Swiss-Prot record:
Residue ranges of domain EGF-like in the record: 17-54
Biological processes, Gene Ontology terms: cyclooxygenase pathway; prostaglandin biosynthetic process; regulation of blood pressure; regulation of neuroinflammatory response; response to oxidative stress
Subcellular location field: Microsome membrane; Endoplasmic reticulum membrane; Nucleus inner membrane; Nucleus outer membrane
Native organism: Ovis aries
Protein name: Prostaglandin G/H synthase 2
InterPro entries found in the cross-reference section: EGF-like_dom, Haem_peroxidase_animal, Haem_peroxidase_sf, Haem_peroxidase_sf_animal, Oxylipin_biosynth_metab
Organism taxonomic ancestry: Eukaryota, Metazoa, Chordata, Craniata, Vertebrata
Post-translational modifications: S-nitrosylation by NOS2 (iNOS) activates enzyme activity. S-nitrosylation may take place on different Cys residues in addition to Cys-525. Acetylated at Ser-564 by SPHK1. During neuroinflammation, acetylation by SPHK1 promotes neuronal secretion of specialized preresolving mediators (SPMs), especially 15-R-lipoxin A4, which results in an increase of phagocytic microglia.
Membrane-protein topology: Peripheral membrane protein
tRNA processing listed as a keyword: no
Catalytic activities: (5Z,8Z,11Z,14Z)-eicosatetraenoate + AH2 + 2 O2 = prostaglandin H2 + A + H2O; (5Z,8Z,11Z,14Z)-eicosatetraenoate + 2 O2 = prostaglandin G2; prostaglandin G2 + AH2 = prostaglandin H2 + A + H2O; (5Z,8Z,11Z,14Z,17Z)-eicosapentaenoate + 2 O2 = prostaglandin G3
O-acetylserine found at: 564
Residues the record lists as S-nitrosocysteine modifications: 525
Endpoints of the signal sequence: 1-16
């Protein structure tokens, strides 16, 4: 009763019209207003009871006593390499642990989805309208006294000031995990099949109606775009040959809309599935590789099934590429990010006897969380030369000049930046970062600590606990005043990282559930789909089950250059700068009106 009285008192003192502004319901309890000044917490199936869902049930109490902290789990999984080498060789142990990883993470994501920016309560509209991003937490009610409910100041600090003071890079900080640019561009390329904000309607809306791994960034979101890029022969996509190698066709040859500045020559306006991928040659590199892979798989299937027509070859190849993508993401991409000695495994059969829903809805917070711009370097090093942002942006001639092989070799060697911790946001994306912060405010995100609680983490009690140091903590204290008013986006980038890790705790604990649910919730992972016949027989099934980032490169890049998602040598080779400005290139250097036309905050 005392806690309830204090929360209501705080709301009244602050002039709150909505008693749920104080976020009184804990442990995923649902707050429902009762009249104008009372609330009721629905604790159903939370494992807790009481007025604010704070008293654990008996079984919950036992689970809490036995459950190790995220820090402990991370330590165990990143140490004792000899033990994990043994575990990885014992199939039933590896399967048991992987099943637990998948279920424990994915069960943190509501399925079916619950809220969106306009519905802080469950509704048919929030469930059925696929044009919205869903929400992990409902938006802060409109009639609250502060932007975060009842905590913090009545106005948030100026977003430009936040970016400049606590996010903007002073000096490049390399990632201690050795993450490279092959990873950075893979992340950017992969996520743009489901992060497709509809800027014309607002940041809470998406054009990616499939809400998952559909490879629309390879094939196109609409049927018209897909058809314009297809050959309609042997299942293949249109292409052109340059210097004996396959590249995407041009905009002129496909009549596909792409975003390019007007001064770009027609022969350099490549047409791919995602209209924004002309922005960076690193994205066009991956677009080229996946184009080659699709057409290669079509050849394999054509040989296996000469009786099949164009449509079946195309559709089956697409399913195979979706499977390859999911396997690469889990076993190479997520494996690298985790730093675990335990080997992650893509095996849909692990979930066949579990309660699991094969559907997914992309959350706005997942989009915000994935703003990993600190990965970007100050310059791009390719074949002994350096390109600054002004030289790199919208410049497909760089890809043609050096070739895909040299791009792969160079990006594999170049280290990316550390995402969490100290200021490491490149100046070139300052405006993009500011837009991300502005849009999260427009969508009325709850505080960083509320998101920590949502993902079963202990809220931070001070800015110093958040950052792990005093100087940054003092800056944040001056900007926000209250740790419970700290915003999600900047907090993710200033949170103290785990030792020798790229991310802080919250990025991992919140990001992993979104990622794994989205990957394993794909229809191809369901019992009805996951069988050889779906993929053209054992030949197609084998392509998926043997996929890796290295095999993708070897099958489609001349010379089969070595690649991985981490640098093998932390000492970077010296390079020559060509026509490079001594200052960092900002967005003003690259025609921001074009860049900001669509989805700038996601690039």
């Amino acid at each position: 009763m005392l806690a309830r009285a204090l929360l209501l008192c705080a709301a009244v003192v602050c002039g709150a019209a909505n008693p749920c502004c104080s976020h009184p319901c804990q442990n995923r309890g649902v707050c429902m207003s009762v009249g104008f000044d009372q609330y009721k917490c629905d604790c159903t199936r939370t494992g807790f009871y009481g007025e604010n869902c704070t008293t654990p049930e008996f079984l919950t109490r036992i689970k809490l006593l036995l459950k190790p902290t995220p820090d402990t789990v991370h330590y165990i999984l990143t140490h004792f390499k000899g033990v994990w080498n043994i575990v990885n060789k014992i199939s039933f142990l590896r399967n048991m642990i992987m099943r637990y990883v998948l279920t424990s993470r994915s069960h943190l994501i509501e399925s079916p989805p619950t809220y969106n920016v306009h519905y802080s309560y469950k509704s048919w509209e929030a469930f059925s309208n696929l044009s919205y991003y869903t929400r992990a937490l409902p938006p802060v009610p409109d009639d609250c006294p502060t932007p975060m409910g009842v905590k913090g100041r009545k106005e948030l600090p100026d977003s430009k000031e936040v970016v400049k003071k606590v996010l903007l890079r002073r000096k490049f900080i390399p990632d201690p995990q050795g993450t490279n640019l092959m990873f950075a561009f893979f992340a950017q390329h992969f996520t743009h099949q489901f992060f497709k904000t509809d800027i014309e309607r607002g940041p809470a809306f998406t054009k990616g109606k499939n809400h998952g791994v559909d490879l629309s960034h390879v094939y196109g979101e609409s049927l018209e775009r897909q058809h314009n890029r297809r050959l309609f022969k042997d299942g293949k996509m249109k292409y052109q040959m340059i210097n004996g190698e396959m590249y995407p066709p041009t905009v002129k040859d496909t009549q596909v809309e792409m975003i390019y500045p007007p001064h770009i020559p027609e022969h350099l306006k490549f047409a791919v599935g995602q209209e924004v991928f002309g922005l960076v040659p690193g994205l066009m590199m991956y677009a080229t590789i996946w184009l080659r892979e699709h057409n290669r798989v079509c050849d394999v299937l054509k040989q296996e099934h000469p009786e099949w027509g164009d449509e079946q070859l195309f559709q089956t190849s697409r399913l195979i590429l979706i499977g390859e993508t999911i396997k690469i993401v889990i076993e190479d991409y997520v494996q690298h990010l985790s730093g675990y000695h335990f080997k992650l495994k893509f095996d849909p059969e692990l979930l066949f006897n579990q309660q699991f829903q094969y559907q997914n809805r992309i959350a706005a917070e997942f989009n915000t969380l994935y703003h990993w711009h600190p990965l970007l370097p100050d310059v791009f090093q390719i074949d002994g030369q350096e390109y600054n942002y002004q030289q790199f942006i919208y410049n497909n001639s760089v890809l043609l000049e050096h070739g895909v092989t040299q791009f792969v070799e160079s990006f594999t060697r170049q280290i990316a930046g550390r995402v969490a911790g100290r200021r490491n946001l490149p100046a070139a994306v300052e405006k993009v970062s500011k837009a991300s912060l502005d849009q999260s405010r427009e969508m009325k995100y709850q505080s960083f600590n509320e998101y920590r609680k949502r993902f079963l983490l202990k809220p931070y009690e001070s800015f110093e606990e958040l950052t792990g140091e005093k100087e940054m903590a003092a800056e944040l204290e001056a900007l926000y005043g209250d740790i419970d008013a700290m915003e999600l986006y900047p907090a993710l980038l200033v949170e103290k990282p785990a030792p020798d890790a790229i991310f802080g705790e919250t990025m991992v604990e919140a990001g992993a559930p979104f990622s794994l649910k989205g990957l394993m919730g794909n229809p191809i992972c369901s019992p009805e789909y996951w069988k050889p016949s779906t993929f053209g027989g054992e030949v197609g099934f084998k392509i998926i089950n043997t996929a890796s980032i290295q095999s993708l490169i070897c099958s489609n890049v001349k010379g089969c250059p070595f690649t991985s998602f981490s640098v093998q040598d932390a000492h970077l080779t010296k390079t020559v700068t060509i026509n490079a400005s001594s200052s960092h290139s900002g967005l003003d250097d690259i025609n921001p009106t074009v860049l900001l036309k669509e989805r700038s905050t996601e690039l």
